[in-house]
Swiss-Prot record:
PROSITE patterns: SPASE_II
The name this protein goes by in its record: Lipoprotein signal peptidase
Lineage, uppermost ranks: Bacteria, Bacillati, Bacillota, Bacilli, Lactobacillales
Pfam families in the cross-refs: Peptidase_A8 (PF01252)
Cellular component GO terms, alphabetical: plasma membrane
InterPro entries assigned to the protein according to its UniProt record, in alphabetical order: Peptidase_A8
Originating organism: Streptococcus pneumoniae (strain ATCC BAA-255 / R6)
Gene designation: lspA
Domain of life: Bacteria
Cellular localisation: Cell membrane
GO MF, one example: endopeptidase activity
The entry's keywords: Aspartyl protease, Cell membrane, Hydrolase, Membrane, Protease, Transmembrane, Transmembrane helix
Length: 153
């Protein structure tokens, strides 16, 4: 039970950080403006993403909300069943849950997701903190599952 409470608190803290950064961006940067943050590495901007990754499937908020809920509920169920498994499995699922819920909050409350990070050194989609949680969480989860498969667990 203690481990579940710790994971829940971590999820809430991660969501809080995501929402805090999004709120700061909305208040400090006009829509569409780009500001250098770490020169030649990362710029900050304010983008209202009404689609999915890379802004695909624009204005399908209900679809994304339903998909997000299904994924988050599935991740919570899987986490519940595998709470005593490896630290990495738990960490990956925790990040996926926090990232999914962070973007879900935006979709439901605003009808779009606030994106802000622009990588200056590569042509890549503008993304947010929750997207980072999701990406890192999926990578960690895949590595943990691959490791379990190799070890025969």
């Amino acid at each position: 039970m203690k481990k579940r409470a710790i994971v829940a608190v971590i999820v809430l803290l991660l969501i809080g950080l995501d929402q805090l950064v999004k709120s700061y961006i909305v208040q400090q940067i006009p829509l569409g403006e780009v500001r250098s943050w770490i020169p030649n590495f990362v710029s900050l901007t304010y983008l209202q993403n009404r689609g999915a990754a890379f802004s695909i499937l624009q204005d399908q908020q209900l679809l994304f909300a339903v998909i997000t809920l299904v994924v988050v509920i599935g991740a919570i169920w899987y986490l519940h069943k595998h709470m005593e498994d490896s630290f990495w499995m738990v960490l990956g699922l925790t990040l996926i849950i926090a990232g999914g819920l962070g973007n879900f909050i935006d979709r439901v409350s605003q009808g779009f997701v606030v994106d802000m990070f622009h990588l200056d050194f590569i042509n890549f989609a503008i993304f947010n903190v929750a997207d980072s949680y999701l990406t890192v969480g999926v990578i960690i989860l895949l590595i943990a599952m691959l490791k379990e498969e190799i070890n025969g667990n």
